[in-house]
């Protein structure tokens, strides 16, 4: 059967999500999930009917939260589908290209590869910021420029001034896609206010992280109405299951937003605990993080990762040499992780 697949698919190395990698243990800090398990009510009496393509109450609720108009919002099956929609809608296969800046989220490249779209890599600088001169030199045939802030896996914020420069240099040439999956942990750093000025800006959001709804698979794309209308041409007819829409509206209600805000504060305290605790271990470097995870450099990253795995503490290995990404869990999980790493280096 494999020989019948498209050539790009035969050669494709799939994205290794945390669940695909697997593992067994009682401390799971490998997928940037929330440790909170919130309860919701759903009405299963309407499951015989299809959902709306873009449920109005859900779109209005997220528009209110994000500070935009409903016509500037599109919901999809996670932000990953938003990535695919943008590539399908704006990139001609075997002609156009996307540009991304590693180390960063791996699905930009994989999604482009599955659609036969060229991937241009412009690595981040040594302090993990945009290399604007190199980006400008590589914009030929580029339709989409993906920027993740806070960046995954490094955790840092991309400089706002550089984002504006990027938007300026790509006007009438390409769309800048800001991946703000983790922006709810630092909302002051959002670029949503730039939508009014830059029609070539699109923003990816999700309920997976700060809203503790990774299993819901609910994402959003924010952009000007003209761009959203293009995406509506290629999205599936019924992309949002009825229970997903109902739960999303509850999560975005005043009570849901208050709970999310409290949980973000709780995770911020645990992140600080992890950062301080690991920084005290000789030879360990903890990079400043703005999401619900930290990138940590160890003297022997691969060995530490394997030792933690065997101890039932499941972390996320990183493409950056000797670096491991650690999600921020509840306090007990953070304490167990810090204690294990301290003992490992004694």
Curated annotation (Swiss-Prot):
The modification N6-(pyridoxal phosphate)lysine is found at residue 209. CDD domains: AAT_like. It catalyses: L-histidinol phosphate + 2-oxoglutarate = 3-(imidazol-4-yl)-2-oxopropyl phosphate + L-glutamate. GO terms for molecular function: histidinol-phosphate transaminase activity; pyridoxal phosphate binding. It comes from the Bacteria. Pfam families: Aminotran_1_2 (PF00155). Pathway: Amino-acid biosynthesis; L-histidine biosynthesis; L-histidine from 5-phospho-alpha-D-ribose 1-diphosphate: step 7/9. One of its GO terms (biological process) is L-histidine biosynthetic process. Its cofactor is pyridoxal 5'-phosphate. Its EC number is 2.6.1.9. Keywords: Amino-acid biosynthesis, Aminotransferase, Histidine biosynthesis, Pyridoxal phosphate, Transferase. Homodimer. HAMAP family: HisC_aminotrans_2. Belongs to the class-II pyridoxal-phosphate-dependent aminotransferase family. Histidinol-phosphate aminotransferase subfamily. This is Histidinol-phosphate aminotransferase. The lineage of its organism: Bacteria, Pseudomonadati, Pseudomonadota, Gammaproteobacteria, Vibrionales.
